[in-house]
Amino acid sequence: MLSPLLKRYTWNSAWLYYARIFIALCGTTAFPWWLGDVKLTIPLTLGMVAAALTDLDDRLAGRLRNLIITLFCFFIASASVELLFPWPWLFAIGLTLSTSGFILLGGLGQRYATIAFGALLIAIYTMLGTSLYEHWYQQPMYLLAGAVWYNVLTLIGHLLFPVRPLQDNLARCYEQLARYLELKSRMFDPDIEDQSQAPLYDLALANGLLMATLNQTKLSLLTRLRGDRGQRGTRRTLHYYFVAQDIHERASSSHIQYQTLREHFRHSDVLFRFQRLMSMQGQACQQLSRCILLRQPYQHDPHFERAFTHIDAALERMRDNGAPADLLKTLGFLLNNLRAIDAQLATIESEQAQALPHNNDENELADDSPHGLSDIWLRLSRHFTPESALFRHAVRMSLVLCFGYAIIQITGMHHGYWILLTSLFVCQPNYNATRHRLKLRIIGTLVGIAIGIPVLWFVPSLEGQLVLLVITGVLFFAFRNVQYAHATMFITLLVLLCFNLLGEGFEVALPRVIDTLIGCAIAWAAVSYIWPDWQFRNLPRMLERATEANCRYLDAILEQYHQGRDNRLAYRIARRDAHNRDAELASVVSNMSSEPNVTPQIREAAFRLLCLNHTFTSYISALGAHREQLTNPEILAFLDDAVCYVDDALHHQPADEERVNEALASLKQRMQQLEPRADSKEPLVVQQVGLLIALLPEIGRLQRQITQVPQETPVSA
């Protein structure tokens, strides 16, 4: 048996990943040293780095397929560079076409986008070493050898730990759920300023991170479910994923305007108790995340029962003291929702809960991957238009790399291909991401050069520099996704050490700085002037997608209030789409903050609209969390009309404003005349409809304000 500390490190995926990188780099440095051909270290190491940057999670058969596709793309990219390099005009044409083609390949999904990036990277790595070997095929074969070496280690790791990446994704899901619940608990803080929207904005951004993690987990599950559904481990992970989705729906639910709660119960302990309970549930999700990583059974905290008992007692005291009955009923709905989350966590390890439902539709996952040649062509052809952000980015990157190549040809820079390498890493689809990377890239390069020159001076031995090369390579991958400036510093050190093997370490230091500055300048100019993808111009389209997804989510919930509760695939797709669109809107609004030409009025309107949309989705989520079959025809008819009205109010033309207002007044009048049964979910349905329609006038006003933005704002910076 492993000790708890040893088990923690044995099952720590980050350490396992770093160990794989370490072994791979040891191989690419030790083998050439053993052969006495240290020059071979450069293509082997660069090929290994490119392979590691394009590593994709999949089952064994999928990994082998990815490896074949990756090696094919790598060879085509590298061999094309070698063959066309002597003819600049042909090379420029090939660079343009291949860059556009590889980037458009990303239209098939993230898997192909990652492979395409690796192919472009291996092409530029080939440009850096065209003078190393006499024959055109030598460097491509060595680069591929480095890539194969890394993938062999990856396959061995997969055979030893086949479901580890899936467990990591599941653990991250519950970690993000914990953060979301903690932020949601702050909405019950009675001391928050009434007009402050910052907590809701933070909650919307956290929802975006959570949805990205859930989507990644779904992809990991899909790759393993094919032909593997009956295994106990698969049932367990699928069950954990469905529980995470259900908890997210309940956690994102809102049953009342929080400002109303603070106004009435600011001096009561009930808000603190709800806040503490949600915080405890966040801690439980965090504990569950750790249990998944360590492969330990989760033990539910027995203190939850006492917390629920105390909240029940607090609500009873408030009832005795004459608190408003409607608010107490709302708090009762909220408490029932939290009890359902508690029940999910308490029973997550039970064998009965992990048994897949007999209805196959309830344990299916939506497969968004391309199927067949016709589907592949359809997905690609959608991006053959300037309306596609991917098409614009493909054209932009083609021009960026060609312009960098032209500078090299005109100036005769010996190491100028680092300009292309910098532009490839820095130039992102939108201005905000590019500006952020640009600054970090420059800082990392300058610090790397400042550290690297003394290192080359004080460590002149070949063996010492090979050891440092391995260390800097491992540190690059360790910081790649958390500290981009640190990662750039370490990759700069790695490059200096590689070229010092040829005796050019000091010679390439200054060109590396100059090329980085030129590459960053080209990338900045490209995202600012070549079809600039300003996020504020995407706001009307993102808002439309969010409102349409919310309407589909409402329709799916309405169907279940008529037919009864289940977790069929269509319902889960509608729910996921609504939260995904909300996350996209949050990303757009966040990226707008640093863009030029966005007026304070538009920025404020977008911020308010994001908060309203997230609140709107949370009101719908409450309807979904409590969904069950209703039998009262009057309530069902009211719900039908309310859902139709919401769709109409979100999509009507300005000329129909008067008709929409009349429909709203009629709906409010009907709502006041309803008599829902207190012992059913009917009061909650009426309450949530009231909350939804109360938001619609302000959402409509901001929609009209935002829709006018593209016509009033200049295109370029």
Curated annotation (Swiss-Prot):
<dbReference type="Pfam" id="PF13515">
    <property type="entry name" value="FUSC_2"/>
</dbReference>
<keyword id="KW-1133">Transmembrane helix</keyword>
<dbReference type="GO" id="GO:0005886">
    <property type="term" value="C:plasma membrane"/>
</dbReference>
<dbReference type="InterPro" id="IPR010019">
    <property type="entry name" value="Integral_membrane_YccS"/>
</dbReference>
<keyword id="KW-0997">Cell inner membrane</keyword>
<dbReference type="Pfam" id="PF12805">
    <property type="entry name" value="FUSC-like"/>
</dbReference>
<feature type="topological domain" description="Cytoplasmic">
    <location>
        <begin position="487"/>
        <end position="489"/>
    </location>
</feature>
<feature type="transmembrane region" description="Helical">
    <location>
        <begin position="442"/>
        <end position="462"/>
    </location>
</feature>
<dbReference type="InterPro" id="IPR049453">
    <property type="entry name" value="Memb_transporter_dom"/>
</dbReference>
<feature type="transmembrane region" description="Helical">
    <location>
        <begin position="490"/>
        <end position="510"/>
    </location>
</feature>
<feature type="topological domain" description="Cytoplasmic">
    <location>
        <position position="32"/>
    </location>
</feature>
<feature type="transmembrane region" description="Helical">
    <location>
        <begin position="67"/>
        <end position="87"/>
    </location>
</feature>
<feature type="transmembrane region" description="Helical">
    <location>
        <begin position="399"/>
        <end position="419"/>
    </location>
</feature>
<feature type="topological domain" description="Cytoplasmic">
    <location>
        <begin position="420"/>
        <end position="441"/>
    </location>
</feature>
<keyword id="KW-1003">Cell membrane</keyword>
<dbReference type="InterPro" id="IPR010020">
    <property type="entry name" value="Integral_membrane_YCCS_YHJK"/>
</dbReference>
<feature type="transmembrane region" description="Helical">
    <location>
        <begin position="113"/>
        <end position="133"/>
    </location>
</feature>
<feature type="topological domain" description="Periplasmic">
    <location>
        <begin position="1"/>
        <end position="10"/>
    </location>
</feature>
<feature type="topological domain" description="Periplasmic">
    <location>
        <begin position="110"/>
        <end position="112"/>
    </location>
</feature>
<feature type="topological domain" description="Periplasmic">
    <location>
        <begin position="164"/>
        <end position="398"/>
    </location>
</feature>
<keyword id="KW-0472">Membrane</keyword>
<feature type="transmembrane region" description="Helical">
    <location>
        <begin position="466"/>
        <end position="486"/>
    </location>
</feature>
<feature type="topological domain" description="Periplasmic">
    <location>
        <begin position="54"/>
        <end position="66"/>
    </location>
</feature>
<feature type="transmembrane region" description="Helical">
    <location>
        <begin position="33"/>
        <end position="53"/>
    </location>
</feature>
<feature type="topological domain" description="Cytoplasmic">
    <location>
        <position position="88"/>
    </location>
</feature>
<keyword id="KW-0812">Transmembrane</keyword>
<feature type="transmembrane region" description="Helical">
    <location>
        <begin position="513"/>
        <end position="533"/>
    </location>
</feature>
<feature type="transmembrane region" description="Helical">
    <location>
        <begin position="11"/>
        <end position="31"/>
    </location>
</feature>
<protein>
    <recommendedName>
        <fullName>Inner membrane protein YccS</fullName>
    </recommendedName>
</protein>
<comment type="similarity">
    <text>Belongs to the YccS/YhfK family.</text>
</comment>
<feature type="topological domain" description="Cytoplasmic">
    <location>
        <begin position="534"/>
        <end position="717"/>
    </location>
</feature>
<feature type="transmembrane region" description="Helical">
    <location>
        <begin position="143"/>
        <end position="163"/>
    </location>
</feature>
<feature type="transmembrane region" description="Helical">
    <location>
        <begin position="89"/>
        <end position="109"/>
    </location>
</feature>
<feature type="topological domain" description="Cytoplasmic">
    <location>
        <begin position="134"/>
        <end position="142"/>
    </location>
</feature>
<feature type="topological domain" description="Periplasmic">
    <location>
        <begin position="463"/>
        <end position="465"/>
    </location>
</feature>
<dbReference type="InterPro" id="IPR032692">
    <property type="entry name" value="YccS_N"/>
</dbReference>
<feature type="topological domain" description="Periplasmic">
    <location>
        <begin position="511"/>
        <end position="512"/>
    </location>
</feature>
